[in-house]
Regions:
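Positively charged n-region of N-terminal signal peptides that target proteins for export
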Residues: 1-4
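Gly/Ser/Thr/Pro-rich low-complexity, intrinsically disordered segments
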Residues: 6-7, 17, 22-65, 72-79, ...
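Repetitive helical segments and hydrophobic/amphipathic motifs
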Residues: 11-12
Length: 477
């Protein structure tokens, strides 16, 4: 239609050159690409980004006539500019830790709307500047929000949201009074041989009010970390690492666990390679009833069933584990030390978790340590944790102990648009913020999960629940 008009206008102009009677003036909008010369013009949108604020600048040809409103729980900033036009088709791309999107729209020929979708209800200031004319939007990058509520007497829950120059962070925090709630370590399926289990089902099977994932584990469900449950060893590691001990006086203690296991038979000492884990080449593995009813081993080893300090059976594979006994499973060179052992021989099994935690009835092996006596104390290097745990931001699960003995269970989402995750140091700082004086790290990544009253509170980074090897649960006393 515009082309037809231009063609007709050209003809009129040509005729106008022949006769003044037919002369015509070119409209303002044709001379300015569709914008009236009487209108204010938005010619450019540009950004300025610092550690403390994001600045959005609209370059104008005249002073702005504008209005501002907030929508979507104050996370959306809407700026309407009146008696203005623009040739801009869209706002320039913006990579920001605080803004999701910027949308530029027009209404009719004289209204322009700019929508700024923020990740949180950030503080924003909108103002004008002259010489040259500009409309400026300053968005402060620091925002923090806590949404606390009491679940029941002795149990409080807080959803924590923070946005700053690092990005958006979302965490879920439970604070439990141990005089009203029991904290327990429970296995997936109640045995290691059962394999892994999703946390929601694990919590339900124990009638738990709340639960978080526990320590590290292998794909078969065996635990990676020095772990004891109700006096029996559940899993071990070669590394000396921070563990949580349930002490005889009822207190919780964070300290270094050091597993040492030895079998004494016929005057010889044979050191254990591990407990309740797959038997490898030349290994000596101890199985107890925490593992399950049977060892599940293959026929390439020899197994000695022990009850009340004596060998009661010698098998080749998949031995039955007595309720009050153990099975010593050996392979390769380890078999040489047991070559002369026969049924009825006395055998001694010694286990120790180190001077600080050996008296604990239950030990949760994980790490590293994060807080000690109210101060940041991250021991990832000393405890020889690999880079996927020690470095970078990730989803995290952590436990803290307050000065009054209350416990903090914390899950932090990561690797998602609503939450960047935390480093170990940032995890320690967040525990500290919620009042913990001592704290340590549990398994994280896709395992990080919190269940409260049968509902998953966080957003696991796998997109759904990852089956885990163990969980820490809260039950009412």
């Amino acid at each position: 239609m515009k082309r037809l008009f231009i063609g007709c206008l050209t003809l009129l102009l040509m005729l106008g050159n022949m006769s003044p009677t037919w002369a015509a003036k070119v409209p303002d909008w044709l001379q300015t690409g569709g914008i009236s010369t009487s209108q204010n013009v938005l010619s450019n949108i540009r950004y300025g980004d610092t550690n403390t604020r994001l600045r959005i600048v609209l370059d104008l040809s005249a002073a702005a006539n504008y209005s501002v409103s907030r929508e979507n729980n104050d996370t959306r900033l809407v700026v309407n500019l009146n008696n203005i036009a623009t040739t801009l088709q869209e706002a320039p791309d913006l990579r920001s830790n605080v803004v999701k999107d910027i949308i530029l729209g027009t209404y009719g020929s004289d209204t322009v709307q700019l929508i700024v979708d923020m990740k949180a209800p950030m503080e924003a200031k909108v103002y004008t500047m002259a010489n040259p004319h500009r409309l400026v939007i300053d968005i402060q990058k620091e925002y923090e929000e806590m949404q606390p509520r009491q679940i029941m007497p002795g149990l409080n829950y807080t959803r924590y949201l923070r946005v700053d120059n690092r990005g958006m962070l979302t965490a879920y925090v439970l604070e439990a009074d141990r005089s009203k709630f029991d904290l327990q370590l429970v296995l997936a399926g109640d045995s290691i041989a059962s394999g892994r289990q999703k946390l929601k089902a694990l919590a339900s099977s124990h009638q738990a009010v709340a639960a978080v994932n526990g320590g590290y584990f292998a794909l078969d469900g065996s635990l990676i970390g020095n772990t004891r449950i109700n006096g029996q060893t559940a899993g071990t590691t070669y590394f000396d690492r921070t563990s949580l001990g349930f002490m005889p006086d009822g207190t919780l203690k964070l300290a270094t666990s050091q597993y040492y296991g030895v079998v004494e038979i016929a005057g010889q000492k044979v050191y254990l390679s591990g407990v309740n884990c797959p038997r490898g080449e030349n290994n000596t593995i101890l199985y107890n009833r925490v593992f399950g009813n049977y060892t599940g081993t293959n026929e390439f080893g020899t197994e000695y069933v022990v009850q009340k300090g004596k060998v009661i059976a010698i098998n080749q594979a998949n031995s039955f584990i007595p309720v009050d006994g153990q099975v010593i499973s050996v392979h390769g060179k380890a078999q040489e030390a047991f070559a002369k052992v026969k049924i009825g021989d006395k055998i001694s099994i010694g286990e120790n978790f180190g001077p600080e935690l050996d008296s604990a009835s239950t030990i949760v092996g994980a790490g590293p340590e994060l807080l000690r006596n109210g101060q940041l104390h991250v021991t990832a290097l000393q405890e020889q944790f690999p880079a996927d745990i020690a470095k970078g931001r990730a989803p995290r699960t952590a436990l803290g102990i307050k000065a009054d003995g209350k416990i903090i269970l914390m899950v932090i989402d990561g690797r998602q648009s609503h939450s960047i995750g935390t480093t170990l140091t940032e995890t320690a700082q967040l525990l500290q913020k919620f009042g913990a004086v001592n704290g340590f790290n549990l398994d994280g990544g896709g395992s990080s999960e919190m269940v409260l009253q049968g509902q998953i509170l966080n957003s696991p980074s796998d997109g759904g629940e990852r089956p885990v090897g163990s969980g820490l649960i809260l039950t009412r006393r």
